[in-house]
């Protein structure tokens, strides 16, 4: 609608680059859940602003077109004041006349987003883009919200929570939680142990409580919200009884713990243990826990894998099922396992893929199977049987004697040979020891080549540190 000839109104549309961006569900001010494009701290926000005239062929006078990236905190008890902690602006067009539809690209490179979006009972933190066509009387604006998640690293210290509480000479209980810091899809595992019971308890429950604090001083507001509640015991316990606890966090709408965000608000989480007796009296104990957001997939995994593969090589002759299978022990582990197995000389040869190697597989993660196999191919000992007590020292004399004399036959009780064979990835292809055939010239050359890579005494100290450096990351520090 024209008003005293000041120009024609238009529609504004903000389109983001990168359709592959993930979306996240964020609760709005009215309580409804909305899907928004998801960005992380340090990511570039780019796209274009499309301006469409309502009446083609008309003219729109403006004083400039701009776009802003804004981070804002809104306190519901002080709606007149919006606290902006981030504001970036870029001019898209100079003042002039717009006579046709136009598109203006924008780019905010590597924007710092230090806080995560949050919508609570008394406060709201949001990030949005605002495109504005500046006019003399009233501006034309368009706002589009985005979701921002802040990823945290694994906590260096994550001690369990253990505490003894109760009423003197009436009730003494000891509760324990496996950790004090949990990621948003973690599982809380713990137990309740009754040391003294002299009152009649009817049931016991555990609840997850969110405490939101806004403002400071006399204008501080506290809001408590029960996120989840579980009944973990029904009936009267006895002395010495232990009640297990297992709570899955993935099914609830949780946020990371926020402490003094821009000196405006805080969000904390507590585990509330409640006991109720037959007279409906309640006994409770609250314990604070820390929640943090873990990445779905490590963002640095690709670069780390490429860097490690520069120093490691997967043999071309390796069968595909062996490359993707469990890793064999490294040099240090294979020498230990050989000496251990050689003590059981009277037993049968060790079958490939023993329980000793399988028990180590659960301790490793993040590293790809190709990296584990390449390391165990480079570090695995040769197939030639050697005495376990001097497996390194006699490696060179054995190589010289194998050329002049035929290789000795392997007996069933040769424990060192069986242990060394099972430690090699080649032996994992079969489930029985190799047949006892005459040594051909080809097998001598193969045996000679394999013995030449056997480490000597002075090289053992140099090999063992490399094995430790390239080992997989323990799951406990993942």
From Swiss-Prot:
Pfam families membership: Vps26 (PF03643)
Biased composition (Low complexity): 303-323, 347-356, 386-406, 416-431
GO molecular function, one term: cargo receptor activity
Signal peptide: none
UniProt xrefs under InterPro entries: Arrestin-like_C, Vps26-related
Record membrane topology: Peripheral membrane protein
GO BP field: endosome to plasma membrane protein transport; intracellular protein transport; regulation of Wnt signaling pathway; retrograde transport, endosome to Golgi; Wnt signaling pathway
The keyword Manganese is annotated on this UniProt entry: no
Region Disordered, annotated ranges: 298-478
Subcellular location: Cytoplasm; Membrane
Gene Ontology cellular component terms for the protein in this record: cytosol; endosome; retromer complex; retromer, cargo-selective complex
Positions with biased composition (Polar residues): 367-379
UniProt KW keywords: Cytoplasm, Membrane, Protein transport, Transport, Wnt signaling pathway
Knockout mutant characteristics: Accumulation of wg in the Golgi, preventing wg from being secreted from the cells.
Family according to the record: Belongs to the VPS26 family.
Purpose of the protein: Component of the retromer complex which acts in conjunction with wingless (wg) and clathrin-mediated endocytosis to sustain a wntless (wls) traffic loop. This loop encompasses the Golgi, the cell surface, an endocytic compartment and a retrograde route leading back to the Golgi, thereby enabling wls to direct wg secretion. The hh and dpp signaling pathways do not require the retromer complex suggesting that it does not play a general role in exocytosis.
Record note on quaternary structure: Component of the retromer complex, composed of Vps26 and Vps35.
This protein's name: Vacuolar protein sorting-associated protein 26
Source organism (scientific name): Drosophila melanogaster
Gene that this polypeptide is encoded by: Vps26
